[in-house]
């Protein structure tokens, strides 16, 4: 026999995977702990390689690495193949009889010894370990029970060629669970003259080693092998009804042990990520009881065809009374199994122990759950949201525990997917990423639907802006305008009006600033103009004219807001800036001609006479007339200018004020200094104006709101109704999109897991595990060009993608056919592997 390459001294053992190291050590009967890490396995492999190269003795190595004597003889090694990449199935923790007395445990141990003696054969390799012996002392009894509970059973991978036969055998046992009791009853009632140990079961079992499925213990696997063998030779067992029976195994103790070990064990952890590709149908039945009748109906045809082709199996059925009709002997009403002798019509109920009562109660729950289903459920998609699939904690599970999908939504998603975990559905429903796959429903343009929804949302938001934001902006604009207008008077520390900052051209602005600043420096403070005889003062210190009132903003006036402009007496008509300037010049002329000597004392006015001064100013004005008409056409400024002229006219310091008013026209240096000083004080003046008049403005706004509260109430009601409708539309659209996205992403993930698993069975270099990060990237980052659904998921908003992935993880973790935990990797880099049953028409 050719020595494999990994036994070469130059071969690096660290390149082997953990599962390969385990298989190699198991093949050469080198014991290793079930919790052994890769470093420990490499050490044992190095010793094995030295033994293969003749450096040490293989016998001594095997003797030094044998299982501890306290382990159960049920820990066995099946027929080992040369396939080093064979998958080791998950370990199952065995739950023994709770609170058993010494007599029952002793009988159980004797029963195990008898069964193990029947299974000795050259084709079934059993580790040489001592049987469990439990003394009658209570202390020793308690220690033995603790050791039995702490065991973990190692079961090797079964060859894939025996999948069909074993599926039929296991499902046959599942369809007629009470047939196991019929077998035992028939065996125990046979003639006691023949010794049980003389019967050779190995000749009937052959090389087939039934893998222990998720809920089958060693003794149950033995019963399956016995039913598959189908030997027509009568089996002679001891008659337990005789009081002098040589074999202490009796009917009551056997049913007690069998009932306890037939209970489903809801295990949730596994020490190995690899498991047998053949799964018992008990997995899907236990997780979804509604599948019980459908699975029985579908597999009954395959069982009948197998019985017709195998005569020995049929003869064994005739011998022990095993038939498909025996399932009718169990009824939930009487809570007992009735065994009918093949040659007699009378039936007698079997005695029940505490363990068998629990088993019967569990079956009652399955029947009740099946009877309570009022609508058909797709048996091809099994989830266990009612049970915890795993007690391991992962980051994504912690993050999304509060957002798990409900059972109804999961059932709707599962019915659309058509996934297969029982090996009955079509392969087209399992492999979804193929070009010739025909969708069950017409293609739905997810992108266009989302675009339509968001476009409609934008229109509604625009209406919302018009109904609410525009009136709010109107309030703000009106308040700002009121602050500016009222700030023209009543601000004692204001050197010049803040609105002059926007006045153009600069020469005219600087002239007025200079005059106002000079007056302030001389102690002349701005004050409100007294109300004329034909006007009345408003509550916000603005002047209301009795005649000719016009609103500045028609839109706000319709809502009750009427910010009237500042009025002047009717005797003064000011319509244009030019008329204002003409009136200004006439006043200047009067002042100049009235006291020319005093005015001429100023250095800048020495060479000026009255006429030349006025003409010079007019020339300067008409140079900027067009700009003034276009920019400075505000009524507020006109009122302010007229008020300023009146104040200057009544001032005793008229001549000095006029000098500072017109000096920038001749001295530009002084103009620059004045403007800089005025601009530096502008922020302070604005704040003072706001603080001074905020109270009066708020009172005015409050009265305006009270006068038109019905209109704003109507706007609020319309806005609430519109917002509610938009919110409901968005919720419905998001729910539909999330459901569709979960269906597409789950189908892609399952198909990729199945393809990778199938490829790894033929190509040992392919890792059957697919990282979760890669699956998420396929759905939401890269997408698949052939799949339109995945291509649309890439363009969804990030929040919707996150919600879809949360539900995808919940669905995949709930499936019994997906391995969620990888103990050799960190939680953030975990991987999934398909360990379910493939359809019969999938070619390996």
Swiss-Prot record:
GO biological process entries: attachment of telomeric heterochromatin to nuclear envelope; chromosome segregation; meiotic cell cycle; nuclear membrane organization
UniProt keyword terms in alphabetical order: ATP-binding, Chromosome partition, Endoplasmic reticulum, Meiosis, Membrane, Nucleotide-binding, Nucleus, Transmembrane, Transmembrane helix
Amino-acid positions noted as binding ATP in the UniProt annotation, renumbered to this chain: 605-612
An example Gene Ontology molecular-function term: ATP binding
Compartments where found: Endoplasmic reticulum membrane; Nucleus membrane
Ranges of Polar residues composition bias in the record: 384-394
A Pfam family matched in the record: HeH
Biased composition range(s): Basic and acidic residues: 395-407
CDD domains attached to this UniProt entry: LEM_like
Its membrane topology: Multi-pass membrane protein
Gene Ontology CC: chromosome, centromeric core domain; chromosome, subtelomeric region; endoplasmic reticulum membrane; heterochromatin; nuclear inner membrane; nuclear membrane; nuclear periphery
Superkingdom per UniProt: Eukaryota
Region of interest: Disordered: 333-354, 384-415
Record's subunit section: Interacts with sad1.
Name of the protein: Meiotically up-regulated gene 61 protein
